[in-house]
């Protein structure tokens, strides 16, 4: 049924009156004939007219048009047809759930209507309101008298308080009797700002008008029951003057207005049972209701078209509404029927005198045979607001309503119960079916707010096939004596066919802890499900409970009533959907094009709700249905509550507010605490019957045994729970949860099951199926349940939403609500009910807050409030916890079925999670609820229930159970567990139900609900913690998938204790123990008996590791966990750092100190079924306790010790994003994903986006994806730190647009190292559980490494870089189809034009005019280079004169005119540093480096690609050189304290030998030994070196200090990027003052750098180059020999900056621009390529195999060297041997020195990197004799003297950086140690001898003529050069731009023409160990990849190798022959396997 939207509050009353008049006119013409069957039950189609009393005092009579009877097949039709229902509904968005049916404000579901028998409605006797009742004037109308045969008339009262005026809106009460055939009566609630709500109900044969006198109705006369018992008169809270209810008979078309009078019309639905008369009356067992006066029935909505006194409604509402939601009483509304709730979310009912009148109007026939008359006592005004008449005790104590019904018929009396926060409303109703007399008592525990139970009120479809099933009106007695609010409801129309699902919107979750019929499990009401809707005060202003009443007598006079006029009002746009958000017309659609002639709104802006055709039944509803929950035009309760309340706010309303679709499907059970969002759209539209059928098909399958056993269990299986906002408000706990449900429930497939189905009717098995094998678990009986809603908590799927006014929502799918079979749980406290099978009356239920382990702890609530965590987040945490525990239970009997159920359950879980989130929000809103309610709220789910465990899911469950109806005492818990409350046990035990496969569904549903909530609910939207929510969503998704897997794995999980369960058990241990003990006996049975039901669940749980079993297992599990924990701890230790960071980042978001808790939580949940269970449980629980409960629960195997160790691992600066690191970060997660217990464990780095590891069920994944998108930033931004493949971790939440994060994590392995995240496919081994914790630590580590290597070995796409290159900003420019040429970056500067850039530079520099020069360059992409590949300068830009201070090279982006159309490529300050400083620096630096050779690095850019050029010169004494200082990428091995060198010397000088190693390798030249020895012999050499190093450091530090401000001035953006994390690695930064952007400096002395990019420089950073020129070139503009800085890919533009060609020519003429031409020059080159570093050594080592292999032994001396060596070899082409040899070659005898060196030098740094002697020694492996080489593989590297050195060793930096000038890999500090090694040994002639053999192989020089004419002739080749001068400072982005420096004709390193000091920051400076670990991994990966092919070839390498293998075939002796002979005995034999190579 489409939901009617509430009329806009702004509409004038006149307009409404006019419409009403029109409708009345129509009504007159169309009247429905009333069926009367004397023997057959007939429903009088006549519908009473609703009277609206307006504040202005105007009275208008509205004739309601008869609503067409909907066909049985259409929900809408059903809704329209019958609004009258035998049940009294609390019009609570949260809707009461009874028998699995949820009463929502929406109209009854079609199935319900179909199921109902025809009802004959006698006119009730008029009962004068007691004087006490109302001060308001009441207009008396003739009441409809009920004949004796008539069973109970249904009463409907609609009260809408005017929130703005602070007055309650008038409530129009209409009573209608409907025929079952037509369908369940449909209610429309309309909430108007000042206008009263009109609810149209089915036609009533007679209309009852109640005269109300006085504004306050203190007493309501109740009709005496057949027993003639009268309830004592009760006081009625004053009814707001505005509110009046009138019922007009059909005959009387005019609407009569009664000021305070409300008409109650009870409609008796004839019971299908053969007894047409009133036998039904007898069938109804005694039911007593205790209503807390505090329950505020501000507004009463007529349920089932029955009219209830507003006072009654308000009375009901008073108790429930105000407290929970903190909403204004005015805003509170009570929606009688779920449909109404769904249809008219905004409608507010005034319940002021409704209750009293309603009860007084009840016919005497209503007395229950053999049942005690229900006494209605007014406890006092429950409404918080003055308007709330909750205090109104509508019923006179003297008056009693006795309802006589067949035992077969289940009395379903529509009742409006106000539930005061402290009061307890209890009622017991006989259960139909096997135990017709059994009554269920629901304890509603609302702290300050009444939970609202939506029990398919008025929607309980009675299946025609079951004559017995009938609804008996229940009387609610308000008991002022009860401080606690308990509402026991046992409304279970027995429907033999099984539970019927209320109308789409009708079925709603019962927010209250009502057993809701599930308690009455013993008496299976297989017949109709009575629905009770109780609105939380906040969300639902009015609550209505309706119970279908079978009319005993057909003799009752038919009442002719005019069909209620449905006021057709213009539906309103929801304002929430995407189209509504669009403000501008598209201009393309037909409506826009025909705007002049068309009045239609743009198609793209048309509301999604309006696009849907309103259902037939929604005509009246439509007005209210489509209300925008978020729009608050006026203080209307529904809208206002939703919009005004923050997600986490105390008010549940905010949580409740969510959009409602037109149809019931769209309607969400926003406020229903347990409204199952089950098939929010699909199932929502279903009729109860359809839903019933659908639910099992969907994931939500009610536990069969349970449902059968106790149909009474309230299942919030509203198909289309469209709780009106009033309803939402009613269920305080649910609003948040309900919203979630509504939002998420749409997604829930099990929504129909969500509707409260008659649990009597439903078998527990069916119910469990609907719940996804999570048999619906009702809370323990009402005595145990503080809130009926808590009772309704689904065992596995739903957490109990406990808290004042928070009602538990049961969502059938996945909802673990106990049906009547479960009632024993409710009956935990001894109850009158026999065998405790039936829930004890709530009175008996102690209102105690949950004991230890209460699901929602104050800490959790505080966290939510203090940490600003959204309810969704908290709930998600709880859900995750619960799911982690529950998964074992969720397993289906058969794996395939389990899988399916798992997927279904996943959806259910998601919905339930959403519901939980809403409920949690409510709880948060209500501080009282925090302890209890949070979990209870969590419990509320749509049919797909997913139990969200708070910190301790079990504790949470217990708390929920305790608070909601489980006995606070352990005994009660035990009873609940034993009484077939296995689900509760599960909750107590850690909510095992979620473990069930259904949990997965629920999880997914919950996630979807969460998404919806976040997207739709203003409160949800308000949550600023979208990231956290996303994480939670991702976690939930993963959990859902995990649960799905668990379903298959549950059995395995059973063997392994669940860590979460264990944790929860700690908190809940005592309770859990009880539950556990009881639970084991429970066997899966469909019997209503509690014990049987429990066994059933126990068995199911056993499959899925039932909670009880889990609890039992927990201790052993802990032990096993401890074993596994040790393993995981080891793993965690390794990866804790990453993980901690990730968690810390998340918790920082949460505002929590220990971020790891949250990740742990994520880990823990999936772990429960899998490996992690044992690990986390043992230690983490205590730690988790510190955190908010969900975290505690979720944490799995966090070992504090490990965490501590992990914390130590890395400095916080390792990850700039996450400056804090968590101790536990390293711990791995195990997520039971994919059906495998073991899965890769994932630790997420703060930066990393967690990706779900195990693929959740499709629903779960999808929902998670949505949720992740909303909540998790699971996107690529966050990098998973690492996964430990052996254990599996359910990835989170969180980034969803990408493939579902959950699916990604589940499917793949995420490894993170130093900011690098690797996502690889999972391995079978990883997923397989090697143990509860997974494989042993060693295996886990090895797998982790392997996975990393695999990942790294794959293309770069597998690597997720922490930083991404800047991409071109989006613009609307016509960039053309081709990709833009040239790199894009703007951190140096950019502008829309060249003129703008000039202005920018002038602003920065501070001067204008000629001081600034702009030159345009064009990117060609073709590198200008000589024929040999060396740099060439085609255009040279020189300084034009002294007035020119700055030159800027800019590039114009083709076809761009945006703000970045022109970007700055290079900035050059001609006078960058003072002249004196430049002179001094040149002098001192050259002296230092000339004397000691510095530490030259061999770089890749040293040579051309062919490695044959001589650009550096051929004289080793004068060749150009490059030295690296500070902390650079090339230096981190030895120059950085993080580079594993004990004594870092970032400015180390290497005074070993003056000659450059590189040239020694090339030329084979060896310096005289005497020279080297002399240097080393000097005693004070070491002291001298130290002094020189200090001087060098001083100069460079000073220069860095001077350049930093200059850099900041000219390139502020780049500067800021480099100093953003200045506090990180502060010791590695250069500069003496704050603001240090540089970490390293490269000193190039006449060094020719071939084209390269400094790829290892920082992202979005720049390189600052300071140039120092020799004295002879400082004053001349064109020196004879110079070195230029070249941009090889750019050419000079044809015009100057102003676009003038002449200007360019003038510059060329003046010499400012020099254009070069081709010249033929004679050059030298090597005939053979110069070998890379270590090549010769390698060759020699090949001859001496042992040498290279032995190096490892030496490297073992220092593990660091080992690492470096491995890393360097892989990362750097440099061979570890080369570095090692350099050190060890010094002394062939001094192995110790070698070992020391080798450890440091292990990284294969190019020997060239070694300075002088060090380089020579290091490079000359040959220095050591072959024997030594064999002995010491490191020595195999050529020494400086050896010819091997002649081979150029490629420096690691060179190889790695590929032409990166800045990145030079200096030798490790160990090289110094090598130098310190005995030189004498090193210089031994023996060392020299090995070189000689190589001399012949040294490259030879050859002359050639360089011809580059082609380059110069073709203008497309680039080659723009700039000639820097002395003291100039150049700024460029060396990482992005290809750059080079030209060679000098005669380089002289001793007196260089140009000294270039290049300052930069390397990319890994801010990472742990400067990326050392990452490089190590890369190197290993490379090694592995390189070794693999070699291994394959190894066997065939040589005969010796074969012999070594001792291949038998090779060893066998054979005779030489000419023919082929085989050793094999058979010629055709083929050997397979590893031995095949032997034959």
From Swiss-Prot:
Disruption phenotype: No visible phenotype; mice are viable, fertile and grossly normal, although some mice have a slightly smaller body size at birth. Embryonic stem cells (ESCs) have reduced levels of 5-hydroxymethylcytosine (5hmC) and slight changes in global gene expression, but are pluripotent and support development. However, knockout mice have an altered response to iron overload. In a different experimental setting, the number of viable knockout homozygous animals was shown to be only approximately one-third of the amount expected due to embryonic lethality. Changing residue 1537 to R: Decreased levels of ubiquitination in isoform 2; loss of isoform 2 localization to sites of ongoing DNA replication in heterochromatic regions; does not affect interaction with CRL4(VprBP) ubiquitin ligase complex. Glycosylated. Interaction with OGT leads to GlcNAcylation. GO terms for molecular function: 5-methylcytosine dioxygenase activity; DNA binding; iron ion binding; methyl-CpG binding; RNA polymerase II cis-regulatory region sequence-specific DNA binding; zinc ion binding. Residues 150-168, 241-265, 825-835, 1053-1064, 1214-1227, 1326-1341, 1850-1875 have a biased composition (Polar residues). Substrate binds at residues 1657, 1960-1962. Residues 1528-1541 are annotated as: Interaction with DNA. InterPro entries: 2OGFeDO_JBP1/TET_oxygenase_dom, TET1/2/3, TET_oxygenase, Znf_CXXC. Zn(2+) 1 binds at residues 574, 577, 580, 607, 1456. Coiled coil: none annotated. Zn(2+) 4 binds at residues 1430, 1509, 1511. Binds 1 Fe(2+) ion per subunit. GO terms for biological process: chromatin remodeling; chromosomal 5-methylcytosine DNA demethylation, oxidation pathway; dendrite morphogenesis; epigenetic programing of male pronucleus; inner cell mass cell differentiation; negative regulation of cell migration; negative regulation of stem cell population maintenance; negative regulation of transcription by RNA polymerase II. It is an enzyme of class 1 (oxidoreductase). Zn(2+) 3 binds at residues 1371, 1373, 1458, 1527, 1536, 1628, 1970. Residues 1-19, 1094-1116, 1734-1743 have a biased composition (Basic residues). Expressed in germinal vesicle (GV) stage and MII-stage oocytes and in early embryos. Also detected somatic tissues, including brain, liver and kidney, but at very low levels. GO terms for cellular component: nucleoplasm; nucleus; Sin3-type complex. Residues 512-657 are annotated as: Sufficient for binding to genomic CpG islands. Residues 1-79, 119-168, 227-286, 613-670, 711-735, 820-859, 882-906, 964-993, 1050-1129, 1209-1240, 1322-1341, 1734-1760, 1830-1901 are annotated as: Disordered. Its EC number is 1.14.11.80. Dioxygenase that plays a key role in active DNA demethylation, by catalyzing the sequential oxidation of the modified genomic base 5-methylcytosine (5mC) into 5-hydroxymethylcytosine (5hmC), 5-formylcytosine (5fC), and 5-carboxylcytosine (5caC). In addition to its role in DNA demethylation, plays a more general role in chromatin regulation by recruiting histone modifying protein complexes to alter histone marks and chromatin accessibility, leading to both activation and repression of gene expression. Interacts with SIN3A; recruits the transcriptional co-repressor SIN3A to gene promoters. Interacts with HCFC1. Interacts (via C-terminus) with OGT. Found in a complex composed of at least SINHCAF, SIN3A, HDAC1, SAP30, RBBP4, OGT and TET1. Interacts with QSER1. Interacts with NONO (via DNA-binding domain); this interaction recruits TET1 to genomic loci. Interacts with FOXA2; this interaction may recruit TET1 to specific enhancers to preserve their unmethylated status and hence allowing gene expression. Interacts with RNF2. The CXXC zinc finger plays a role in TET1 chromatin loading and participates in binding to CpG-DNA. However, the global chromatin binding can be mediated by the entire N-terminus and occurs even in the absence of the CXXC domain. The zinc finger domain impedes association DNA replication sites and prevents aberrant 5mC oxidation. This is Methylcytosine dioxygenase TET1. It comes from Mus musculus. The gene is Tet1.
